[in-house]
Amino acid sequence: MNRQDLAVPLRLLGVSLLVFGLLYQGSLMAIGDAVFPNSSAGSPVYVDGQEQPVGSQMIGQQFRPGQPEDVQYFWSRPSANDYNAMTSASTNWGPTNPLLSERVRADLQNISQYETPDDSVPVNLVSESGSSYDAHISPAAAEYQVLRVANQTGISEQRLNEMIDEATKEPWLGIWGHERVNVLELNLMVRDALNEQNETDQNSDMNASEIANGDH
């Protein structure tokens, strides 16, 4: 094989790397940034004008029963990797796998420690998604948790149901997919409502203190 025989495949390799490795990928990134800037950046969620996002609309976070700090929030689906976006994988345990039965029983026990409308736990609350970091639950799974969240936060059930309606996404084009509730979006609404309650309580305490001191 002479140099001329090698030149053709090497030139083809170089052109392919340039076109498909740089130009094609670069053009897709440029188009994505121009047309879908939020989606191309990972659909980050910002609150209160912070520079750092609190999460992503497309990647779930660990809101789970068994974590005391999450009792006042809506729980997300189980995750095999603690919602680590660097390792997208589920356990793929089959229905006869004893490890799956053990994990589901533990989830059901944690859920049953708090107020529930009935014993029919929605499957979303005890089953992983295929990626193991699904950011959504079904409306039924969210509504099942309203009683607990209302009792833990003091937010009325009516207002919580309104939050669920606001956080519910419809099927794409009304056809593909199912109705789904973004857990992070819903919990940010709960957090805002709790902050409003705290501000109201603080103002009430200040007014009561002023009255007691004879300022009014």
Swiss-Prot record:
Q: Which GO terms describe its cellular component?
A: plasma membrane
Superkingdom assignment: Archaea
Q: When this gene is knocked out, what is seen? A: kdpFABCQ and kdpFABC deletion strains are only able to grow in the presence of K(+) concentrations above 60 uM.
One Pfam entry for this protein is: KdpC
Q: Assembly and interactions?
A: The system is composed of three essential subunits: KdpA, KdpB and KdpC. The complex also contains KdpF, a small non-essential subunit.
**Topology in membrane:** Single-pass membrane protein
Q: What does the UniProt induction comment state?
A: Up-regulated in response to K(+) limitation. Induced under desiccating conditions.
Specify the protein name: Potassium-transporting ATPase KdpC subunit
Q: Which HAMAP family match?
A: KdpC
Which residues lie within the region annotated Disordered? 197-216
Molecular function per GO: ATP binding; P-type potassium transmembrane transporter activity
The subcellular localization recorded is: Cell membrane
| Biased composition annotated in UniProt, kind: Polar residues | 197-207
InterPro entries per the UniProt record, alphabetical: KdpC
The transmembrane segments are 12-32
What residue range is the signal peptide?
A: none
Return the similarity comment: Belongs to the KdpC family.
Q: What does this protein do?
A: Part of the high-affinity ATP-driven potassium transport (or Kdp) system, which catalyzes the hydrolysis of ATP coupled with the electrogenic transport of potassium into the cytoplasm. This subunit acts as a catalytic chaperone that increases the ATP-binding affinity of the ATP-hydrolyzing subunit KdpB by the formation of a transient KdpB/KdpC/ATP ternary complex. The Kdp system is essential for growth under K(+) limitation, and for survival under desiccation and salt crystal inclusion.
Q: What is the lineage of its organism?
A: Archaea, Methanobacteriati, Methanobacteriota, Stenosarchaea group, Halobacteria
Q: Which UniProt keywords apply?
A: ATP-binding, Cell membrane, Ion transport, Membrane, Nucleotide-binding, Plasmid, Potassium, Potassium transport, Transmembrane, Transmembrane helix, Transport
